[in-house]
Amino acid sequence: MARLYDFYKDSVVPELMKQFGYKSIMQVPRIEKITVNMGVGEAVADKKVMEFAVGDLEKIAGQKPVVTTARKSIAGFKIRDDYPVGCKVTLRRERMYEFLDRLVTIALPRVRDFRGVSAKSFDGRGNYNMGVKEQIIFPEIEYDKIDALRGMNITITTSAKTDEEARALLAAFKFPFKG
C-alpha cells in the first residue's frame, strides 16, 4: 500500500470527521483521481516533440499517457482535425497516492522561489487545479536528456462537496498552501 493512503486512513479521516462532524467515514472526502495534462503545441511543426513529451510524462507518472488530438481545424494555429496537440495521464488508487507523495515532498520544494501553491485554484466543486512551469522539478527527469522545458497542468479531483472541505483534505496531506 502507498504510504499516503495509510496516512489518509489512520490520520486524515478521523481529523476530518471531527472537524466537519461527519457521522460515517463514507462522508469524509477523498481524492478520486489526479490528471496530469501536458499541452504540446509545438508538435504541429515537429512530430518528434510529441514523443519526447510522452516519454517525460510516462517517467513522471509511471503510466503510459494518452495522446490528445485537436477537436477541430484552426487555420490560424496551423492545426488540423485529429492532429496530436498534447498528452494526459489519469492516475487512480495506488499510483495516485504515490504521485501525490512525490509531488508534495519532492517536486514542489524544488520549484525556484517556491512560496506555496495558491489556495484560490479550487473550482467551486471541491477540485483543485495547479500549473507547473517546468518538468525538471520531478527527480525522474534527467536534466541532460530533455529537449525543452515543458509545463503541465495537474488536476486533483476529490469527492468533497465544497472548496472548504477539499482544502481541509489537501491541507491534511501537508499540501503547501500560501499563507
Swiss-Prot record:
One GO biological process term is: translation
Q: Which InterPro entries match?
A: Ribosomal_uL5, Ribosomal_uL5_bac-type, Ribosomal_uL5_C, Ribosomal_uL5_CS, Ribosomal_uL5_dom_sf, Ribosomal_uL5_N
Keywords tagged on the record: Ribonucleoprotein, Ribosomal protein, RNA-binding, rRNA-binding, tRNA-binding
As for family, the record states: Belongs to the universal ribosomal protein uL5 family.
**Could you describe the subunit structure of this protein?**
Part of the 50S ribosomal subunit; part of the 5S rRNA/L5/L18/L25 subcomplex. Contacts the 5S rRNA and the P site tRNA. Forms a bridge to the 30S subunit in the 70S ribosome.
Give the protein's function. This is one of the proteins that bind and probably mediate the attachment of the 5S RNA into the large ribosomal subunit, where it forms part of the central protuberance. In the 70S ribosome it contacts protein S13 of the 30S subunit (bridge B1b), connecting the 2 subunits; this bridge is implicated in subunit movement. Contacts the P site tRNA; the 5S rRNA and some of its associated proteins might help stabilize positioning of ribosome-bound tRNAs.
Protein name per its UniProtKB record: Large ribosomal subunit protein uL5
Organism name:
Chromobacterium violaceum (strain ATCC 12472 / DSM 30191 / JCM 1249 / CCUG 213 / NBRC 12614 / NCIMB 9131 / NCTC 9757 / MK)
